[in-house]
Amino acid sequence: MTLEGHACAFGAGTIINAIATWKGAAFGIDLKTFADVELSESESVITGSIKEVPEGDTRLIERCVELVLGRFGLELGGTIRTWSEIPLAGGLKSSSAAANASVLATLHAVGETMPSLEIIKLGVRAAKEVGVTVTGAFDDACASFLGGIVITDNRNMKLIKREEADSRVLIFAPSKKAFSADTNVKRSRLIAPYVEMAYELALAGDYERAMTLNGFLYCGALGFDTEYMLRALECGVKGVSLSGTGPSYAALVKADQVKELKSAWESCGMEGRVIETSINNSGAISFNREGSS
């Protein structure tokens, strides 16, 4: 008998990158990653595939399935397949979304449930074990799974605050990729005292100033161009940042700012695409093939 599970989780944008201080903040965005799991007692290994990258590294999604099966003492094998609307290695939390969707789809397949934060922590553990993240990305994982705006303590894997928000989001996603595990941690740690100031702004609910300060700090530390941020500020945008460790930029925008900022970013000269989306508040879901949750 084959057990099947299906789930999706969302991407996220950065308010505070946690690499400098282990404290982070992020917001869910309405770009999805889907996972399909098929399991059987006749199989003994988990084999993963990523639709957009046939030769891509599948250790994360495979490890997520293995950890769920281990949690419930199940000896099953099979396949895990993911596909995504989120640009890979762009700072938009594609790994967190893939981990969350993989864990949730596996739970769906085996008919088990876990509390939301335990699901998130299992995906974070898988990400740490296979080396795709520096801090464990607990902030990104919470934003991806829970939706809304989250503030976290990544070192202790604590969710400090979550609230819903309503905003359009404009993203500039360069064609080049930047893998989180390759980022310059030493230079990021140099800016820790100033990132701490941005984190305090986030705790006070001043998310736009927090993310903009975060963006200038990390662009400086990691060598990314601040022109995209300055163009956003020229358009009247209050909240814009390098997302994650780059190379994407994300801005919280009003409806009447979308066209102007899109044009400003497209005229900057870097190859890439502008994505228009919004903050997602609803969080990850599992569903049957017909799409019912």
Swiss-Prot record:
Compartments in which it is found: Cytoplasm
Gene Ontology terms, MF aspect: ATP binding; shikimate kinase activity
Domain of life: Archaea
Pfam families: GHMP_kinases_C (PF08544), GHMP_kinases_N (PF00288)
Entry's Gene Ontology BP terms: amino acid biosynthetic process; aromatic amino acid family biosynthetic process; chorismate biosynthetic process
Pathway linked to the protein: Metabolic intermediate biosynthesis; chorismate biosynthesis; chorismate from D-erythrose 4-phosphate and phosphoenolpyruvate: step 5/7
Residues at which ATP binds: P87, L88, A89, G90, G91, L92, K93, S94, S95, S96, A97
E.C. designation(s): 2.7.1.71
Catalytic activity: shikimate + ATP = 3-phosphoshikimate + ADP + H(+)
Family: Belongs to the GHMP kinase family. Archaeal shikimate kinase subfamily.
HAMAP family according to UniProt: Shik_kinase_arch (MF_00370)
UniProt name for this protein: Shikimate kinase
Organism, scientific name: Methanosarcina mazei (strain ATCC BAA-159 / DSM 3647 / Goe1 / Go1 / JCM 11833 / OCM 88)
Originating gene: aroK
